[in-house]
């Protein structure tokens, strides 16, 4: 039997350094024999996307007595993307084998990945050429992150032994059910979700008006045919509803190849009158 590799891993998240998800993930990985460095926001930073801190100082410090003592842990006042940048360029003496982000408390499915700090932390690793993994538990209330952490350990070992030809970000959503109720693992494509957005008008104790973003998710919307997506592969939203672990490969390049081809083929820009 091939011995398990000892991997150099960076772990971050957007739920903050004290969240149960990142603690379970990091402790599970170090217990499996890996070298683990944790750099996380010092507070909740969900839905911050890929924002960076550019106009105020970033403060960071070593965190003790939160994780397994074998783990080097830091908290950072910045965003999830800041945390990964800081880890790669100010904390770790060499780049990690993989960047992991999570385990997030709540799903990151469909177009939600565009807002997700969890996915953006992993995307920062990918931008640096490091294979990266974003892990999310499909529940905002469940508290058992162990099945997700165990799957993460299994996945990084598989990725090490069978690497893809190019670095990829894997967005992985794990059902919040007992391990025996997980239906399996599915390769998925990104779905399309929209929300019924509501800005609730409220007033603070001083009578000043403010707004609170609320709303509910609208059912998944079919994606247009011109995207030429492989319909045989289910969306992450569909497979997650059936209690599958979903694995969606993502990239940072947002170029609309279909749009480029149409514009080039029709000489569309030739008709732009700009003197």
Swiss-Prot record:
It comes from the Bacteria. GO terms for cellular component: cytoplasm. It catalyses: a ribonucleoside 5'-phosphate + H2O = a ribonucleoside + phosphate. InterPro entries: SurE, SurE-like_Pase/nucleotidase, SurE-like_sf. Its cofactor is a divalent metal cation. Keywords: Cytoplasm, Hydrolase, Metal-binding, Nucleotide-binding. It is an enzyme of class 3 (hydrolase). GO terms for molecular function: 3'-nucleotidase activity; 5'-nucleotidase activity; exopolyphosphatase activity; metal ion binding; nucleotide binding. Nucleotidase that shows phosphatase activity on nucleoside 5'-monophosphates. Belongs to the SurE nucleotidase family. This is 5'-nucleotidase SurE.
């Amino acid at each position: 039997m091939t011995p398990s590799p000892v991997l150099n891993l960076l772990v971050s998240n957007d739920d903050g350094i004290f969240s149960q998800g990142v603690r379970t993930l990091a402790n599970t990985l170090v217990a499996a024999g890996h070298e683990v460095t944790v750099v996380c926001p010092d507070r909740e930073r969900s839905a911050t996307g890929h924002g960076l801190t550019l106009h105020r100082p970033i403060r960071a410090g070593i965190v003790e007595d939160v994780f397994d003592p074998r783990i080097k842990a830091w908290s950072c006042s910045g965003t999830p993307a800041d945390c990964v940048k800081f880890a790669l360029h100010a904390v770790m003496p060499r780049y990690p084998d993989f960047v992991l982000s999570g385990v997030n408390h709540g799903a990151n499915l469909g177009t939600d990945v565009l807002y997700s700090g969890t996915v953006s932390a992993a995307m920062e690793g990918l931008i640096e050429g490091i294979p990266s993994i974003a892990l999310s538990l499909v529940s905002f209330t469940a508290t058992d992150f162990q099945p997700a952490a165990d799957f993460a350990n299994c996945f990084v070992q598989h990725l090490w032994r069978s690497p893809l030809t190019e670095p990829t970000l894997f967005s992985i959503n794990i059902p919040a059910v007992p391990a025996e109720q997980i239906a399996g693992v599915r390769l998925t494509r990104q779905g399309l979700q929209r929300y019924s957005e509501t800005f609730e008008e409220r007033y603070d104790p001083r009578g000043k008006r403010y707004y609170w973003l609320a709303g509910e998710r609208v059912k998944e919307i079919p994606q247009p045919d011109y995207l030429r997506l492989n319909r045989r592969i289910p969306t992450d939203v569909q497979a997650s509803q059936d209690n599958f672990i979903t694995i969606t490969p993502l990239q940072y390049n947002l170029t609309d190849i279909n749009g480029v081809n149409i514009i080039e083929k029709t000489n569309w820009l030739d008709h732009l009158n700009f003197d």
